[in-house]
Amino acid sequence: MIDQLISELVAYGLENGLIDDADKVYVTNGLLELFQRQDYQEPEKLGKPRKLQLILDDLLEFALSQGILEDDTVTMRDLLDTKIMGILTPAPSVVRKIFEEKYQVSPKAATEFYYHFSQATNYIRTDRIIKDEKWETDTEFGKMVITINLSKPEKDPRDIAKDGTAKKSGYPACLLCRENEGYAGHLSHPARQNHRIIPITLCGEQYYLQYSPYVYYNEHCIIFNKNHIPMAINEITFNKLLDFVKQFPHYMAGSNADLPIVGGSILSHDHFQGGSYVFAMAKAPYEQEFDLESYPDIHAGIVKWPMSVIRLQGRAMDSIVAAANHILTKWRGYSDPEVNIFSDTDGIPHNTITPIARMRGDLYELDLVLRNNITTIDCPLGLFHPHTEYHHIKKENIGLIEVMGLAVLPARLKKEMAELEQAILNHEDLRQNETVAAHAEWAEGWIPKYKITDSNIHSIIQKEIGIVFAKVLEDAGVYKRTDEGKAAFKRFIESL
């Protein structure tokens, strides 16, 4: 049985370009060592090619039966199947050489190769990502994309218990560091033997390109600094983002903000995110245009979007960077008490920007999303943060991906929405149902609008979740889409 499985996996590696015939014996021997086998008889023929995950699952079952896999938990299985795939994964130098050769053909050819490679090695676990729920909701700002993230497995209590007694390591310093390439991992850090990163240069500095293992959108990539240094939004950030889209014009690139609450989950390591995907924000038009006197070659305006966005367009990268830095500098020190915008309190800064860069034909385009992370007694999680009434759907920070119009919602919603569907169809008292009680007030607000049946309830709930997401983005917007908010936004524009 194990000979058959090893032969299947080697055939998969050959078919998907991970290895060639010269590597076949070498890789086979590596797998034999891993599975503690001293004998091997190559099967005369293999059956119909199977999906990678089916082969890996069978190999894991064999490993479990032999005591090679200690515990049958998701974490332990992931550590071992990554080690298995690491044996098939070419050395970094090989992958980088192919990427460079493909880049000479075109940037798109290079990223297409690298993306398919990252899927073939199982670094991107496509079998899990397809479990994510995804749909679109029409709003006045365009089609919002809503996802329920089901691809990140939850920790097994057995692994949590083991991890609690394990010796802690500071290597790699974080999940983004270049030292992850080839790292074996442990209970609290994923294995990365099948991970390969691509060096790129942005404004003379060394960065690396990789894909997100969770791929929230097409070719979702991460561009991270060679060094473990904190996130920062400044003039060089704008320059680097535009330099990236200049080198990869078919990709967009953006940065999370550099302050807590309005930033992403990793503020400790300088990085950007990008990919081959057109977000709803990119499709949103100018709502109001204005002139920047010092930058006459820049087409500037406010974008029709639930958050407060200034868009800059131009042919000269230097002009856009200078204009963006001017706006950032102004915004960092700007207060407007009439609309609760304070640049700092007790010396703690609150204003920052979430920037997004893209090419629009032969024009550079930079969207600057104004952010403020002030908290109040009534809003301890943030004044410009999802309001309490929407926490049953979304209470987490609004980061870069969501700013652009793609919701990443927690896995708990899948079960809760399924129960909500049944409770509504059964005309239950929603407030008496422990699982859906948190959603009761929200659901009671829209149930009367529809003639609900078992054939439309699912799509109705999806639509209403999408509407909530648009509202959540409005909550995160520093200038509300009211007459008062628009007048306040105008005051800031005039200050430029």
Q: Model features per residue range: what roles?
A:
Residues 1-223, 227-230, 304-306, 321-324, ...:
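Active-site microenvironments that recognize anionic phosphate/pyrophosphate groups
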Residues 194-198, 229-253:
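Helical scaffold of the NTase/Pol beta-like nucleotidyltransferase catalytic core
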Residues 207-212, 237-245, 291-298:
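Structured alpha-helical segments in the cores of large, soluble enzyme domains
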Residues 233-240, 316-319, 323, 461:
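Short amphipathic alpha-helical segments
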Residues 240-244, 326, 468:
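Amphipathic alpha-helical segments that form well-ordered structural scaffolds
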Residues 245-265, 274-326, 332-335:
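Catalytic or ion-translocation cores adjacent to nucleophile or general acid/base/metal-coordination motifs
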Residues 260-268, 346-352:
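Beta-rich nucleic-acid/ligand-interaction surfaces
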